């Protein structure tokens, strides 16, 4: 998304594509998308025979694609006759490069990209220029314009997917920049690569028509909870470049003694999965294929950021967190000790517990004494207390003692993670441990990639 973001928006305003198609029509666009995409792809293949050899193999389910696969000589798995059947089977199952998974959320778009590192000299020679351009653009940049970021510290190296070895890259950008991303796909000629994007999240419905009309790209829409479960189980199974993917906080309430420690999720079931994005969904997971959505709440990361924008005038999520880190919520919240003068011993409520979030703001004097940082901190504690309370009740009702918190709300948000960890430990009397994951916000996109590759 380089410096082209502003330029692409101008192109869109000048008529370079139909961004902004009526939303009520987008739910019906899937059938039209498939028909139009198939016709356009057939014509493009006629014009460009090199597409038949765009460094991997055509997706299954098409008679024409099967004939294309049979035309390709050689085996990617080696020259021995014993290895040929397996290699041929892998080639027939895997789609063409590039391999992407998309999770289009209400606030952020998460994209995972598999970069093949085992490309042979023959493949590189036959590789079309648009594919080389895409790979170079995504892997040689860390930032894409002012909003796109590749999380280099999360890169997974030396993975094997569908018989190909490579690295997995993790990229994010704000959802409001999706039109510019689609335009970039058009500029880089994505559609000539016979690319079908596997996408999850609400935006896969919202932007489906734009992908088709602007980028000439098809979206295969996937259930976001299916992708979430599949993604977290896969990432946990491959680990984090030799390190543990899962972790917890020891002594979360003590800033000096607090430690981040690895946790081995070798027996993941049953598992309570708390996905904190713009809103919150809570899932009870009993096996890879057996799970249910227990409940959720509309008070999530979007609520925190939105309220901080209103109360403090901040403009970014990172700015809101920075302000919260310097604030004192006790100047904003009414505590148990403010009501009882100390602990409420009969029900075991300590004096420092919050009795009423923002309760002190009823007083004019206390409103004037509270800083923007105090308001941001109180907002963060309000949201995390609510999520922690609901998660605890769900864990008790479902008789589950492993609670994993994921989602982009937790990105660079150690304060919230420690608050959740302490709340869960305190109110459960040590019976519940809050667990977290290094790739917290990318599991949906990983699940979408696995679906593209048909990995169970």
From Swiss-Prot:
<keyword id="KW-0418">Kinase</keyword>
<dbReference type="GO" id="GO:0007005">
    <property type="term" value="P:mitochondrion organization"/>
</dbReference>
<feature type="active site" description="Proton acceptor">
    <location>
        <position position="224"/>
    </location>
</feature>
<feature type="modified residue" description="Phosphoserine">
    <location>
        <position position="75"/>
    </location>
</feature>
<dbReference type="GO" id="GO:0005634">
    <property type="term" value="C:nucleus"/>
</dbReference>
<keyword id="KW-0808">Transferase</keyword>
<feature type="binding site">
    <location>
        <position position="278"/>
    </location>
    <ligand>
        <name>acetyl-CoA</name>
    </ligand>
</feature>
<dbReference type="InterPro" id="IPR043129">
    <property type="entry name" value="ATPase_NBD"/>
</dbReference>
<dbReference type="GO" id="GO:1904251">
    <property type="term" value="P:regulation of bile acid metabolic process"/>
</dbReference>
<comment type="similarity">
    <text>Belongs to the type II pantothenate kinase family.</text>
</comment>
<keyword id="KW-0597">Phosphoprotein</keyword>
<feature type="compositionally biased region" description="Low complexity">
    <location>
        <begin position="55"/>
        <end position="65"/>
    </location>
</feature>
<feature type="modified residue" description="Phosphoserine">
    <location>
        <position position="56"/>
    </location>
</feature>
<dbReference type="GO" id="GO:0007286">
    <property type="term" value="P:spermatid development"/>
</dbReference>
<dbReference type="GO" id="GO:0019217">
    <property type="term" value="P:regulation of fatty acid metabolic process"/>
</dbReference>
<dbReference type="GO" id="GO:0005524">
    <property type="term" value="F:ATP binding"/>
</dbReference>
<dbReference type="GO" id="GO:0005829">
    <property type="term" value="C:cytosol"/>
</dbReference>
<keyword id="KW-0809">Transit peptide</keyword>
<keyword id="KW-0067">ATP-binding</keyword>
<dbReference type="GO" id="GO:0015937">
    <property type="term" value="P:coenzyme A biosynthetic process"/>
</dbReference>
<feature type="modified residue" description="Phosphoserine">
    <location>
        <position position="55"/>
    </location>
</feature>
<comment type="function">
    <text>Catalyzes the phosphorylation of pantothenate to generate 4'-phosphopantothenate in the first and rate-determining step of coenzyme A (CoA) synthesis.</text>
</comment>
<dbReference type="GO" id="GO:0001525">
    <property type="term" value="P:angiogenesis"/>
</dbReference>
<feature type="compositionally biased region" description="Low complexity">
    <location>
        <begin position="28"/>
        <end position="39"/>
    </location>
</feature>
<dbReference type="GO" id="GO:0051881">
    <property type="term" value="P:regulation of mitochondrial membrane potential"/>
</dbReference>
<comment type="subunit">
    <text>Homodimer.</text>
</comment>
<feature type="binding site">
    <location>
        <position position="293"/>
    </location>
    <ligand>
        <name>acetyl-CoA</name>
    </ligand>
</feature>
<dbReference type="InterPro" id="IPR004567">
    <property type="entry name" value="Type_II_PanK"/>
</dbReference>
<keyword id="KW-0173">Coenzyme A biosynthesis</keyword>
<feature type="binding site">
    <location>
        <position position="281"/>
    </location>
    <ligand>
        <name>acetyl-CoA</name>
    </ligand>
</feature>
<dbReference type="GO" id="GO:0009060">
    <property type="term" value="P:aerobic respiration"/>
</dbReference>
<feature type="region of interest" description="Disordered">
    <location>
        <begin position="16"/>
        <end position="89"/>
    </location>
</feature>
<protein>
    <recommendedName>
        <fullName>Pantothenate kinase 2, mitochondrial</fullName>
        <ecNumber>2.7.1.33</ecNumber>
    </recommendedName>
</protein>
<dbReference type="GO" id="GO:0005739">
    <property type="term" value="C:mitochondrion"/>
</dbReference>
<dbReference type="GO" id="GO:0005758">
    <property type="term" value="C:mitochondrial intermembrane space"/>
</dbReference>
<dbReference type="Pfam" id="PF03630">
    <property type="entry name" value="Fumble"/>
</dbReference>
<comment type="pathway">
    <text>Cofactor biosynthesis; coenzyme A biosynthesis; CoA from (R)-pantothenate: step 1/5.</text>
</comment>
<dbReference type="GO" id="GO:0090207">
    <property type="term" value="P:regulation of triglyceride metabolic process"/>
</dbReference>
<dbReference type="GO" id="GO:0004594">
    <property type="term" value="F:pantothenate kinase activity"/>
</dbReference>
<feature type="short sequence motif" description="Nuclear export signal">
    <location>
        <begin position="154"/>
        <end position="161"/>
    </location>
</feature>
<keyword id="KW-0963">Cytoplasm</keyword>
<keyword id="KW-0547">Nucleotide-binding</keyword>
């Amino acid at each position: 998304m380089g410096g082209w973001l502003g330029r692409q928006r101008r192109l869109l305003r000048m008529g370079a594509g139909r961004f902004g198609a009526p939303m009520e029509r987008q739910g019906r666009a899937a059938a039209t998308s498939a028909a139009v995409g198939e016709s356009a792809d057939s014509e493009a293949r006629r014009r460009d025979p090199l597409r038949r050899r765009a460094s991997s193999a055509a997706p299954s389910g098409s008679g024409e694609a099967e004939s294309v696969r049979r035309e390709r000589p050689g085996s990617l798995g080696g020259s021995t006759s014993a290895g040929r059947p397996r290699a041929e089977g892998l080639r027939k199952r895997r789609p063409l490069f590039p391999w992407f998974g998309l999770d289009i959320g209400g606030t952020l778009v998460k994209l995972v990209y598999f970069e093949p590192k085992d490309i042979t000299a023959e493949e590189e020679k036959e590789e079309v220029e648009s594919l080389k351009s895409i790979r170079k653009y995504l892997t040689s940049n860390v930032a894409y314009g002012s909003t796109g970021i590749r999380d280099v510290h999360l890169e997974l190296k030396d993975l094997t997917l569908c018989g190909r070895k490579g690295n997995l890259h993790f990229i994010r950008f704000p959802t409001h920049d999706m039109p510019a991303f689609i335009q970039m796909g058009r500029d880089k000629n994505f559609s000539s690569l016979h690319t079908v994007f596997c996408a999850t999240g609400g935006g896969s419905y919202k932007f489906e028509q734009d992908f088709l009309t602007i980028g000439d790209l098809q979206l295969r829409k996937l259930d976001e909870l299916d992708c979430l479960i599949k993604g977290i189980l896969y990432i946990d199974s491959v680990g984090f470049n030799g390190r543990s993917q899962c972790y917890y906080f020891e002594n979360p309430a003590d800033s000096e003694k607090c430690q981040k420690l690895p946790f081995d999720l070798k027996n993941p079931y049953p598992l309570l999965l708390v996905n904190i994005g713009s809103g919150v969904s809570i899932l009870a997971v009993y096996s890879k294929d057996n799970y249910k959505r227990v409940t959720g709440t509309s008070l999530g990361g979007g609520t925190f950021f939105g309220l901080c924008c209103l109360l403090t005038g901040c403009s970014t999520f990172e700015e809101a967190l920075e302000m919260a880190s310097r604030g004192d919520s006790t100047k904003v919240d009414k505590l148990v000790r403010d009501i009882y003068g100390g602990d409420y011993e009969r029900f075991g409520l300590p004096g420092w517990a919050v009795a009423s979030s923002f309760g002190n703001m009823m007083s004019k004097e206390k409103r004037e004494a509270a800083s923007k940082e105090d308001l941001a901190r109180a907002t963060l504690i309000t949201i995390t207390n609510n999520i922690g309370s609901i998660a605890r009740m769900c864990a008790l009702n479902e008789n589950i003692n492993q609670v994993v918190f994921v989602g982009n709300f937790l990105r660079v948000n150690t304060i919230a993670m420690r608050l959740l960890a302490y709340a869960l430990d305190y109110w459960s009397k040590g019976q519940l441990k809050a667990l977290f994951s290094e790739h917290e916000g990318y599991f949906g996109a990983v699940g979408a990639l696995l679906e593209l590759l048909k990995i169970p």
